[in-house]
Amino acid sequence: MASSLRALYAVLAMVLLGVLASRSALASGAVTLVLPYLAWGTLIIGVCYRVWRWARVPVPFRIPTTCGQQRSLPWLPRAPLENPDNAMGAALRVGFEVLLFRSLLRNNRPRIEEGRLAFSPTRALWLGALAMHWALLVIVLRHLRFALEPTPNWVVSLGALDGMLQIGAPPVLLTDLALFAALLYLLIRRWRDPALRYLSLFSDYFALWLLLGIALSGIAMRYVWRVDVVAVKQLVLGIVTFHPQVLSAPAPLLLVHLLLVCALAIYLPFSKLMHLGAAVLSPTRNLANNSRRRRHVNPWNAPVPTHGYAEWEAEFADKLKLAGLPLEQDQDARHPTAD
């Protein structure tokens, strides 16, 4: 019951945002004049603050998580990507993690099968997450055509590649379908799985519903209730060049879409959606595993008085001689080294 209420609250929050955009923004123009700058200022400052906080956390130990053979004897095959021993390997590992979600691809889910513990891969989750993130990235890059004048050729080519199937008019974009299907799958998965539903918080549902609301409002503006693309570009260019303007013709769906995007920008630095920065800055990912070849001394350790072997041997020399044990200082005296 509690998990159902959390999902319902997330839906109600989305409806409230939509009503707020369609009602108040038409009268005051707050969504087009004030909110974009507030949202992007919060996003930039919030992300920089979170990264600064993470960067200040001390890492006293080298703690990379590995799943392959590290560099060792020459005749042992090693895994340079799974267990990197230098900075280049660690950078490649982080890059593949960010771009391909390799740890999620290897993720297994435990289950009880015929009274025994079994593990099954979660390839569907990996594919859904990968499709959602890549589709979202391509959509953001496509939207640069509204913020840049003239539009770069690579943005035009990216839009043409996205609509290469040429289905309908305007053509159906593959990333629109991929983003909608991936978000719907992630929502259904979180709702159908009893254990996952029990562990889900309001923030988990709200992030998915917010992204789904942005996707649906954008799809509706392209295929159902079309808006004036020229007016949209003028609006976005005005925001980017710090000359904001109010829409000449009412466009409630566009205002809802813009409000949801601004809400996402404000919400992102304070939510789990900041996991991209965490993946890059995580010491379990971005450190090389070379502790066997190189000693890493904690720079902020307090100086500790040491008692080396030479001092220990000098202290107990008489007892060692009585026990008949050889002394290194005697051997050094018999075999002096030439300078």
Task: Give the predicted meaning of each segment.
Residues 2-12, 51, 83-96, 125-142:
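Alpha-helical transmembrane segments of integral membrane proteins, especially early/N-terminal helices
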Residues 2-5, 11-15, 20-25, 38-45, ...:
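Membrane-proximal intrinsically disordered regions of secretory-pathway and membrane-system proteins
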Residues 5-66, 237-256:
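Long, highly hydrophobic alpha-helical transmembrane signal-anchor segments
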Residues 10-18, 87-118, 122-125:
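Long, hydrophobic/aromatic-enriched structural stretches that serve as scaffold segments
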Residues 27, 104-242, 246-252, 256, ...:
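Long, contiguous internal "core" modules enriched in hydrophobic/ aromatic residues
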Residues 35-99, 290-294:
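Membrane-interface amphipathic/juxtamembrane segments adjacent to transmembrane helices
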